[in-house]
């Protein structure tokens, strides 16, 4: 993300809100942002929970010249309905695009890893990536819950790893881990994130950092496919 604010005719920007805090005259809650969060579980239209701090909207850039700040949109989604092709054609086209997307993101001179939750999105990405780079160069990472088995989906992640023959590193996440790490999670998030998944992702990321520098995930699948 790109966060920015203007204080006493000075334009500040950073990739994290915490980097802007020392330059704020008064740290206050943005009530409109808070209303958005409580209603939609996120802030709308570039608002944040900090008064005076904004987030650059997607597909926009900022132009600053002679003290004037302008916002410009450089990309827009256009939907063109195609009734001339079959469902099979679109399925094949989508498969090709997904493979190309993963192929584009594994261009690295270090071994690749993948977050494997056991769900569809991360499983597809990790399966394709492991096939592209070779199972010896790929590794999966997942969390499991031995104490709360009703929430544990590590068996699905293991099934994927077995099918594609890549190693799967697992971390058993406990309530003690939550107690010891929740402050770090809050610090790195800057703003609250609806849902408990960010904590689990933090723990799995700590595990992955010991083995890989580049790790792919399945985030964004719901937004793209309407899941």
Name these PLM-found stretches:
Residues 203-227:
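Active-site adenylate/phosphate-handling loop in enzymes that bind or generate adenylated species
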Residues 193-200:
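Catalytic subdomain that performs nucleotidyl-dependent activation
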Residues 1-189, 201:
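Cysteine-centered catalytic environments shared across enzyme families
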